[in-house]
Amino acid sequence: MKSLSFLNHEFEAFPSPELALTDPNGLLAIGGDLRPERLLSAYYNGIFPWFNSDDPILWWSPDPRAVFIPGEIHISTSLRKYLKKQPWRITINHAFTDVMAGCAQPREKQSGTWITQEIQMAYRELHHTGHAHSIEVWEGERLIGGLYGLAIGQVFCGESMFHRKTNASKAAVAALQQHLLKMGFKLIDAQVMNPHLESLGAKAIKRIDFITLLSELRNNPVDPTTWTTKEVILELE
């Protein structure tokens, strides 16, 4: 039976994602807090927070789930040609706080953002403990795009991306895919399908299949140098 759980500030296990509501799709629990242990427990179990600044904390596990397989993200020929011409520089974990701030800026035709100050503080803490990571795209010394997310074993859980110049966020996605492939990652969680993700090659899979994949990959070790601060040279041949 589908049911909505209410969490308090005592740390407790999340309910099974299979109990999430169908309307709204995937809403599983309300309340709790954003302490690192709770956030990591959420992602470890296929759950993520998503709420507006005037809402309580809402926890989600939608069905279906949007995912990418590293190596299958679509980088068009025209985009490859475009990126080859750009004098951009791409880095990993060089400016996590600035990337989050960029992602938090309201989009066109939007008045607010779900990446509240509370969310930013929580994920900065996860970054400091080595769980949350960013990809940055630079033009000179100016940050023009990027993305951030969490690494759970061989799964990268993408959270948000932004751009200040055309295709800069796509450059970040291309760099992420290239890096994850080299480091042996098997899955990218993109959470909720939308036309933009679909155009890049995202697949919608059943929640139960996502949870199964996650359970197989979340404890797999990765190279300890995966998320050291470094520059990425895009290979676009």
UniProtKB/Swiss-Prot annotation:
Function statement: Functions in the N-end rule pathway of protein degradation where it conjugates Leu, Phe and, less efficiently, Met from aminoacyl-tRNAs to the N-termini of proteins containing an N-terminal arginine or lysine.
Reaction equation(s) it catalyzes: N-terminal L-lysyl-[protein] + L-leucyl-tRNA(Leu) = N-terminal L-leucyl-L-lysyl-[protein] + tRNA(Leu) + H(+); N-terminal L-arginyl-[protein] + L-leucyl-tRNA(Leu) = N-terminal L-leucyl-L-arginyl-[protein] + tRNA(Leu) + H(+); L-phenylalanyl-tRNA(Phe) + an N-terminal L-alpha-aminoacyl-[protein] = an N-terminal L-phenylalanyl-L-alpha-aminoacyl-[protein] + tRNA(Phe)
Keywords, comma-separated and alphabetical: Acyltransferase, Cytoplasm, Transferase
Keyword Magnesium: no
UniProt GO cellular component terms: cytoplasm
Name this protein carries in UniProt: Leucyl/phenylalanyl-tRNA--protein transferase
Keyword Nucleotide-binding: no
Its EC number(s): 2.3.2.6
Similarity field: Belongs to the L/F-transferase family.
GO biological process, one term: protein catabolic process
SUPFAM superfamilies, per database record: Acyl-CoA N-acyltransferases (Nat)
Organism per entry: Shewanella baltica (strain OS155 / ATCC BAA-1091)
Main location: cytoplasm
One GO MF term: leucyl-tRNA--protein transferase activity
Lineage top rank: taxon: Bacteria
Cellular compartments annotated: Cytoplasm
Pfam family for this entry, one: Leu_Phe_trans
